[in-house]
Amino acid sequence: MAGYQEERDGSEHSVSILFTRSAGEQAPVTAQLALLPDELGNKTAEIILNGQSLGTIQNFSEEGNAKLSEKQTTELLTALKGNASIEVVFGEFKEKVSDKGAAAAMLKMDEFQQRLNTPSALIRQGQEKHAVLAQQAAPKIEAVSVNNRQTTELKRGEKQFDAVLALLRKSNGTNEDAENYCYELHKDDVWNKQITLYPLTKGKVLAQAICSSSAYNYTNYYAVLDGKLSKVEQVLENRYNYADYDKNTHILKIEGSFKARGLGDCWHGQEAVWNGKTFILTKEYPSGSCKGFPGGAWGPLPTFVSELKVK
């Protein structure tokens, strides 16, 4: 659960507080504070809760993050159950952190972790003894290493480029209202000037071409072809814009990373790997709200993770 500076007219200085709790009955809640490094001044900050100081925070990382004490965390959580006035003083600045929706977010945390009406709940505490959500191992996903990792670039004007492009366009269809339709793929312009072929296993090939582009994002069109480049066997969702082989495991990974706005302070993305038959999702994440932190206040906040098993 992450909170950010309160929106107001005029200049805002980026502030975020992140509360984290693992699954498990005895799992504690930890909290971190994030500020922009250039605004930290003497590398210390102070939290003012309902007019009272919670003490000085030090030991900020180079990224501008610092862990709060157990006492500071507990007092903030207690106050956020109702109306809380939270101010952070740092350098020459003072910024108010919004408490809107905090109680509802904590209730959602309790509900997801099956803590409602138990002693470990944050909001709706009770004496029920039922089990809460236990920690679970990340799902194991198989990926295969690729022996031949020599990519091929097909250039516009080459006979093979034209043939493969025709296959890709046919596989993408002609319905411009379709969710997976790629406008740039069907245009003969500067964006659509090369196709990259990545060898897979069992004689198959991954083809990469441009799909769409905007002011600050682009997607690629990815399709699995047979080794003779005569037919498209699989088409991937338009969620990716990068492919490469891992230098250590030699697996082929595709990634998608996208800004929510041009400032680049909020992102979302996902990753997938070739398992010998298809590409399977291995990671998915947002980065939180758009609040002025380059890359997001906390970087990727995964909603899905996995453990890779390479064959």
Q: Language model features by range: what are they?
A:
Residues M1-C182, Q194-L197, T201, L281:
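A generic "folded-domain core" signal
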Residues Y4-Q5, L33, A207-S212, E255-R261:
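Short beta-strand segments that buttress and anchor functional surface loops
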Residues G24-E25, N50-Q52, G82-N83, P199-V205, ...:
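Short, solvent-exposed coil/turn segments at beta-strand boundaries
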Residues F161-E184, S287-E307:
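Surface-exposed loop and turn segments in beta-propeller and other repeat-based domains
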Residues S171-Y183, Y221-L236, V273-I280:
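Surface-exposed loop/turn elements that mediate protein-protein interactions on large endomembrane-trafficking
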Residues I195-S214:
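Exposed beta-strand-loop-beta-strand "reactive/processing" segments of non-cytosolic proteins
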Residues A215-A223, G264-E271:
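Structural motif
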Residues E233-K311:
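Short aromatic loop motif centered on NTY/YTY
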